[in-house]
Amino acid sequence: MNKFFLAPSILSADFARLGEDIKKVIDAGSDLIHFDVMDNHYVPNLSMGPMILESLRNYNITAPIDVHLMVKPVDNLIPQFAKAGATFITFHPEATLHIERTLNLIKENGCKAGLAFNPATPLNFLDYILEKLDLILLMSVNPGFGNQSFLPSTFNKLREVRKIIDANFSDILLEVDGGVKLDNIADIACAGANVFVMGSGLFKYSNYKLVIEKIRKKLEYAHSRSIH
């Protein structure tokens, strides 16, 4: 594993200048956009729907977009977000009665499929559907709000999922979301993550390019540690 992907979280962007801000962070060296969708039911917060995603595509945002559905139920929204321009659609196992059917629905609508795990969600769901996944998302905070601290218990979970992925010779992406900062991203990478959702840890800075250069250096260091 020698490629790392930065995924700025749209929740921390400037909503008054959303398209402009997202374009700036992509041009500064980000790889994809993390698009959080919350329903004030599955999680205690409310965010945006497919119209916002479609508007970003119309603004000529061409980078991959990972739509993270923190909603319940989930299936009726999948075709809408796929049509609006999602690249990945990621959902939580608690949000559907039939995980495999929901994964199939995502694929049928032309998107890559991800499964998200809250800090307290067990990993045994992976025993049944690993081969259908393109991405596994581990929440390193309890979902619903930004600017939370990274939960240290996530490290063991990351190592466990990395072993599962590698044991199956899989190229599934392993994403972590919550409290990812300059001072911990190298340790998170060494634990097995290769996609890093960054909210306030990136958007709070005025010079995105400079911060991303610093992040890349941290990740280069993590990669050098992992191969020795």
UniProtKB/Swiss-Prot annotation:
- What does the Swiss-Prot or TrEMBL cofactor note state? Binds 1 divalent metal cation per subunit.
Q: Which reaction does it catalyse?
A: D-ribulose 5-phosphate = D-xylulose 5-phosphate
User: Coding gene?
Assistant: rpe
Q: What is this protein called?
A: Ribulose-phosphate 3-epimerase
Known InterPro entries for this protein?
Answer: Aldolase_TIM, Ribul_P_3_epim, Ribul_P_3_epim-like, RibuloseP-bd_barrel
Q: Which positions in this protein are listed as binding a divalent metal cation?
A: 34, 36, 68, 177
What this protein is reported to do is described as: Catalyzes the reversible epimerization of D-ribulose 5-phosphate to D-xylulose 5-phosphate.
Q: Which family does it belong to?
A: Belongs to the ribulose-phosphate 3-epimerase family.
Q: Which residues does UniProt mark as catalytic?
A: 36, 177
**Xref: CDD domains:** RPE
Q: Which residues bind substrate?
A: 9, 68, 177-179, 199-200
Q: Which organism is it from?
A: Buchnera aphidicola subsp. Acyrthosiphon pisum (strain APS) (Acyrthosiphon pisum symbiotic bacterium)
Pfam families recorded for this chain?
A: Ribul_P_3_epim
Q: Which GO terms describe its molecular function?
A: D-ribulose-phosphate 3-epimerase activity; metal ion binding
Q: SUPFAM superfamilies of this UniProt entry?
A: Ribulose-phoshate binding barrel (SSF51366)
**Mind giving the lineage of the organism this protein is from?**
Bacteria, Pseudomonadati, Pseudomonadota, Gammaproteobacteria, Enterobacterales
This enzyme's EC code(s) = 5.1.3.1
Q: Name one GO biological process term.
A: pentose catabolic process
Show the PANTHER family listed in the entry.
RIBULOSE-5-PHOSPHATE-3-EPIMERASE
